[in-house]
Amino acid sequence: MPTIAELLSQELGQKLEYIENVIALMDEGNTIPFIARYRKEMHGAMDDTVLRTLETRLQYLRNLQARRDEVKSSIESQGKLTEELAAAIDAAATLAEVEDLYRPYKQKRRTRGSIAREKGLEPLAQAIFAQDGSDPAVLAEAYVEPEKGVNSVEEALAGANDIIAEDLSDDPAIRKSLRELIARKGSLVVKAEDPEEDTVYRLYYDFSCPISRVMDHQILAINRGEKEEKLKVTVTLPGNEGPATVCRAALKPTMFISQFVKAAAEDAYERLIFPSVQRETRSDLSDRAYSGAIHNFALNLKPLLMQPPVKGFVTMGLDPGYRNGCKVAVVDATGKVLDTTVVYPTFSDRKKQEAIEILSRLMRKWGVSHIAIGNGTASRETEAMAVEMLRSFPNASYMIVNEAGASVYSASPLAAEEFPEFDVNLRSAVSIARRLQDPLAELVKIDPKAIGVGQYQHDCPQKELDGALGAVVEDCVNAVGVDVNTASKSLLLQVSGLNATTAKNIVAYREENGAFTSRAQIKKVPKLGPKAFQQCAGFLRIPESKEILDNTGVHPESYAAARELLKLLGTDDLATLSARLETYGAAAAAEKCGVGELTLIDIAKELSKPGRDPRDELPPPVLRKDVLEMKDLVPGMELTGTVRNVIDFGVFVDIGVHQDGLVHISEVCNRRLKHPSEMLKVGDVVKVVVLSVDEKRHRISLSMKQVKKQA
């Protein structure tokens, strides 16, 4: 039997040595970001996505092995564990297969079959199931015992039927065959609870789809409709194939067909096996759909967090609103709040002009060059006001910012701690401004589920969702690196090796002793021990340090190697260091510097651009100076937009009209896609052509593949 490491090696297509190394590193308490970045030689430079998959599968396989051992121990305690059964349990590849094998030996609640056994009818059931041509009624006469509760031949036969049906239901081979049959030929059939009622689920009022072809988003929508008691859902098989599968397994291949056993097999199918396997099938479909939804949420979240920051500018944040007005915050280039106010542009034309005058004064007073506008209530009116104002500021521009989660953050204890003197509403304006300046630093303060780029995220298992999204946030923060002297506690909390206590202690140490001047000083933070320092040091940046390496992704353990590399290749032109290393030969240089080749390549990359931010290499966000309305759109119009969400059936694109347009999956490109994420991610800047506009239903249909045709 293959080991867990061997199974993972086969599944992931990675060398066994690398898999064993990663497992050992994880068991020693090393984090995924640390392993991915600083132990590349040990795993052949697997990226964090592969390492996360490995971690998940490792946990599953370890749980599977633990369950195998539990099941074998339980069966052995009953004196029923054979070598064949133990081998079958060890060979079971999934938890479902293990449970199938355990099913006959599990302690059950009282069933019709167990009651019949208590009445002493098991020998009768075995005799009938032998199918040797004996008449079941004649065999049953010997089991009529009123004192045991068997008052007639009919009652004896009914009990025997229940035992046979239960035994067939517990047969793992039969259940597996039926499961495979449903997967191949089954259909998911959906009907309306009330066909006359008009609901959002009308699309599924008369829906049927092969199990093998039903889409994840369809499963999630159907599940929600069923939960809300708007839909009825069943799994069906064609003709008589389900009962026939059980009968084939139950009946012996002889000239004589036992009608009694056939009837018991059909009863087992209808009453016990099919309802159970149908539930399992629905559960498997849901698990698949939830996994897909969580995967898509994670795919969408990563580029959203990794949006390029708009650095070095004084920024105005506008949190639109009607009754409570438009909240305004001006922050400097570092995110420090300079000014706040509230204006009421939607109350009247006079109030709108008054708002423009107030904002114009703030623009001039603080030298504002960028405006971030939240995309929520009253966003359209606020944008129109901003565009009118910007006619007097030709060098300024604006961007609509996704404000999802801003209100949640502004009312949180974290926001109260950060801005105790500000009203809740003004805090959200600050958050919106900072989202333009540094999306990652601001979004880490918010529960990822509140960011709003998921599909049915509230229906997904929350533990799995939280784990997947938490991993994305952690990977993004560590990929970028964190300035230890300016980072919030929320941001530090996501750094490899740090926890709530050490993150809080770093902030406290900074406030008490002033800015950190070296990475080595981080060791003085209370409760931050050697292991935590090892895991976090490479991801913490100190721009103020006299040691240039402290502002790079080079780990302190490799400082000597970095200095040796500079001695070897010179320090004249750091920007060309990577190219010069390639010319010299990375393998030869690595040997001289005393580190692995992959590590040295990373060191050269970091030295060539100290303080580099991987987000700066991505396309910048689309900033605007004017505004479009839906009525301005006409079919054939070409526009540039930003991908806001990627879901199973397409992508939603912000084209600057307050209503994201949909590029259906069939309009993304000329080849067939299984999922839009094969081509696109959140934050991508794309060219689209308008296909149709439905103002009444607020729907815009777009195409990417037809852009060239229109050119």
Where are these regions (language model features)?
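Duplex nucleic acid-engaging cores and interfaces of nucleic-acid transaction enzymes
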Residues: 50-53, 60, 64-317, 321-421, ...
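C-terminal accessory/binding modules appended to enzymatic or scaffolding proteins
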Residues: 13, 308-309, 474-508, 625-663, ...
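Long, charge-rich intrinsically disordered scaffolds of nucleic-acid metabolism proteins
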Residues: 97, 399, 405, 410-480, ...
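Low-complexity, acidic/Ser/Thr- and charged residue-rich accessory regions of DNA metabolism proteins
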Residues: 142-146, 151-153, 207-208, 234, ...
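Long, charged amphipathic helices and adjacent flexible linkers at domain junctions
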Residues: 280-298, 450-483, 590-635
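Accessory alpha-helical DNA-binding modules that contact the DNA backbone or grooves
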Residues: 31-32, 43, 47-114, 119-147, ...
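A glycine-rich phosphate-binding loop feature that marks nucleotide/adenosyl-phosphate handling sites
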Residues: 180-187, 318-322, 376-380, 401-408, ...
